[in-house]
Amino acid sequence: MTALTDPTKGDGMRTLVTGGAGFIGSALVDRLAHAGHEVAVVDDLSTGRLENLADAFASGRVQHTEVDLAGPDLAEAVAAARPEVVYHLAAQIDVRRSVSDPLHDARVNVLGTIAVAKAALEAGSRRLVFASSGGTVYGEPDPSALPIDEHYPPGVTNPYGVAKRSAEDYLASFAELHGLEPVSLRLGNVYGPRQDPHGEAGVVAIFCNRLLADEPVTIFGDGRQTRDYVFVEDVVDAFVAGGEHPDAPGARLNIGTGVETSVLELYQALREVAGFGAEPAFAPARPGELARIALDCAQAGRVLGWRPKADLADGLARTWAWAFQEVNAGSVGG
């Protein structure tokens, strides 16, 4: 098997990014367009913003189609793009909503993934890189096993994790039956520029927005719950490698840092970057949330040659600088 592109020759390819107007998706679109690839963005704009694609549109290599993943127009949009590689990032990402409305979560995260895979096959796509969840597919891990690798058995903590694991398995069946090349990236808690401060899964963005608005920061639970925070540009590196590396097909890979950071430690680190910030308020813990998680990402290094580059201090500084600029421009907050 050969790589899909030879970056030394500047070969472009046809790509498609679902959720490409969102936080991670738009960063990936920027990278692909800058590398000379044609990018079709499929996004229903329920949470994504076309403003995130302003620079990508200026390249002349990016087009957007507003499509519901589970709707009848998806196959036509994918067929029109004829992508060699599909990057599937569109998702329902709110763990709390998966608990309160598991039918909606399954419709988007399971049926939507099946629909994307089917459309990709029909369009002649060779590879599909899927945004899975390293924070939920393993359930509540044994603390003594942290950081956990991909051999850790799957567990059940919330419907979101169940849906992501089911989607991975469906993609594996498409590989077995139809020859699709799936790559599932089990992401840690991704943060960075363009993350929605009004969303449900972006604690760094929420904290930045609260600090900049001089509003109190609320931490759910005692703040000692840990996450593996990974910077968005490092995650984009992993997606690009997943789409191009000859050894990637069939892999299910953790993408994180291997470092546990508590919510309290995260907030303190952000206060140090900002240079100000009051003590947080506390509220009851939310159902379905993990107590601790950290991901062993050595396998991603072996398969993709990937490793995270940004440590938490650097990533938070870059995220804070972006959020500060956006507030001054009137784009964030309110």
Positions of PLM-derived features:
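C-terminal "lid/loop" region of Rossmann-like NAD(P)-dependent oxidoreductases
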Residues: 222, 250-253, 261-268, 275-292, ...
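Amphipathic terminal alpha-helices
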Residues: 2-4, 312-334
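N-terminal Rossmann-like NAD(P)+-binding domain of SDR-like oxidoreductases, especially those catalyzing
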Residues: 2-190
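Conserved mid-core alpha-helix of short-chain dehydrogenase/reductase
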Residues: 115-119, 229, 234-241
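Non-catalytic, hydrophobic alpha-helical segments
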Residues: 235, 239, 255, 266, ...
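Glycine/proline-rich active-site loop of Rossmann-fold NAD(P)-dependent oxidoreductases
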Residues: 165, 190-206, 215-216, 220, ...
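Hydrophobic "lid"/C-terminal helical patch
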Residues: 28, 239-243, 267-270, 297, ...
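Residue-level signal for the nucleotide or nucleotide-sugar donor/cofactor binding architecture
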Residues: 48, 100, 108-111, 151, ...
